[in-house]
C-alpha cells in the first residue's frame, strides 16, 4: 500500500526554474496555445486536410479518436504519422467499420509499425463505444463534456483516466471538434497532460515530482489547462525544423516559448 495518502511527500524542485516556467506561461496565456495549435501544429493541418476530403464530420471525428488511441510507440515523428493517416483516409475513406479500416491501414503504415497486433486489439475494444456515437453526441462532448469523453474512452479501453493515449485522444478530439464545429472550446483543467517521453524528460529538469501532479499544479497557478500547456511546450521539445519556422512566423512571443523549452 502506498503511504502517499498518509505522508505528505516532499519533492525536490528547482524553484528558480519552476518560477520562470509559471511566469512565462502566464505571460503567454491560453491564446498563445491556441495560435500554436491552429497555426504551428502540423497535426492540426493534417486533420483539416482529412476533413476537407472526407465531407463526413461523424466519420472524421471517429477516425481521429480511433487513430489517437494507437498513436504510441511510433516508428516516425508524430507529425509525419498524422499526415500519413490523413492522406491515407482522404484517399481511402472507410467503407464499413472504422475499426476495420484502421486495422487494414496499420500493418502497411510507415510511421506506426510497432506493436500492431496490440493496437488492433485496442481498436476492437473501442469499437462498440465508437459505433454508439452520433454526430449530435460528438457535438455534445465537444461543447459540454470533454471530461465525459475522457471517462468513456478510459472505460472502453480498461485504462486509467490519466493514461497517455486516453488524454491524447481528448486533445486530438478537441482539434477535430474545433475544425468540424468551427468554434474554439478550451480543454478542461481536469484533463491531464499526456505523460510522454518528452514531457517526462522536461519535467525531470525541474522536479522529481511525478509529471501529472506537477503539471496539474502548474495549470492551477497559470490558469492554463494542462493540454494547452502541452501545446505551448511541444514545438521546442519536438525539435522539428518546419515547426520551429512556423512558430517564429506566427507567434509574437516565440522567443519566450524557446526560453521555456531551454529551462
Curated annotation (Swiss-Prot):
User: Gene3D superfamilies in the record, alphabetically?
Assistant: Hypothetical protein, domain 2 (1.10.340.30)
The GO terms this record gives for MF are: class I DNA-(apurinic or apyrimidinic site) endonuclease activity; oxidized base lesion DNA N-glycosylase activity
Q: Pfam families, from UniProt? A: AGOG
Q: Which residues bind 8-oxoguanine?
A: 43, 71, 82, 168, 194, 230, 234
Q: Any keyword Iron?
A: no
Active site, per annotation: 164, 196
**InterPro entries membership:** AGOG, AGOG-like, DNA_glycosylase
The EC code for this enzyme is 3.2.2.-, 4.2.99.18
Q: Where is this region: Helix-hairpin-helix?
A: 139-204
The record comments on the domains as follows:
Contains two alpha-helical subdomains, with the 8-oxoguanine binding site located in a cleft at their interface. Contains a helix-hairpin-helix (HhH) structural motif and a Gly/Pro-rich sequence followed by a conserved Asp (HhH-GPD motif).
Question: What is the protein name for this chain?
Answer: N-glycosylase/DNA lyase
Tell me what organism the protein belongs to: Thermococcus kodakarensis (strain ATCC BAA-918 / JCM 12380 / KOD1) (Pyrococcus kodakaraensis (strain KOD1))
Amino acid at each position: 500500500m502506498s503511504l502517499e495518502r498518509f505522508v505528505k511527500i516532499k519533492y525536490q524542485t528547482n524553484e528558480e526554474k519552476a518560477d520562470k516556467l509559471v511566469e512565462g506561461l502566464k505571460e503567454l496565456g491560453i491564446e498563445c496555445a491556441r495560435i500554436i495549435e491552429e497555426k504551428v501544429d502540423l497535426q492540426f493541418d493534417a486533420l483539416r486536410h482529412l476533413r476537407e476530403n472526407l465531407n463526413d464530420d461523424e466519420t472524421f471525428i471517429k477516425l481521429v479518436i480511433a487513430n489517437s488511441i494507437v498513436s504510441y510507440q511510433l516508428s516516425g515523428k508524430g507529425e509525419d504519422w498524422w499526415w500519413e493517416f490523413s492522406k491515407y483516409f482522404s484517399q481511402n475513406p472507410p467503407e464499413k467499420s472504422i475499426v476495420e479500416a484502421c486495422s487494414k491501414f496499420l500493418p502497411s503504415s510507415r510511421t506506426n509499425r510497432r506493436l500492431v497486433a496490440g493496437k488492433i486489439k485496442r481498436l476492437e475494444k473501442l469499437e462498440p463505444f465508437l459505433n454508439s456515437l452520433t454526430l449530435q453526441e460528438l457535438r455534445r462532448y465537444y461543447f459540454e463534456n470533454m471530461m465525459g469523453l475522457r471517462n468513456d474512452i478510459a472505460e472502453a479501453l480498461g485504462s486509467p483516466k490519466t493514461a497517455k493515449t486516453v488524454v491524447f485522444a481528448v486533445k486530438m478530439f478537441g482539434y477535430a471538434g474545433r475544425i468540424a464545429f468551427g468554434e474554439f472550446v478550451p480543454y478542461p483543467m481536469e484533463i491531464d497532460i499526456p505523460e510522454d517521453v518528452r514531457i517526462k524528460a522536461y519535467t525531470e529538469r525541474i522536479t522529481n515530482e511525478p509529471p501529472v501532479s506537477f503539471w496539474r499544479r502548474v495549470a492551477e497557478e497559470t490558469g492554463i489547462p494542462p493540454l494547452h500547456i502541452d501545446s505551448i511546450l511541444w514545438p521546442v521539445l519536438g525539435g522539428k525544423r518546419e515547426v520551429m519556422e512556423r512558430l517564429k512566423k506566427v507567434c509574437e512571443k516565440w522567443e519566450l516559448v524557446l526560453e521555456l523549452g531551454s529551462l
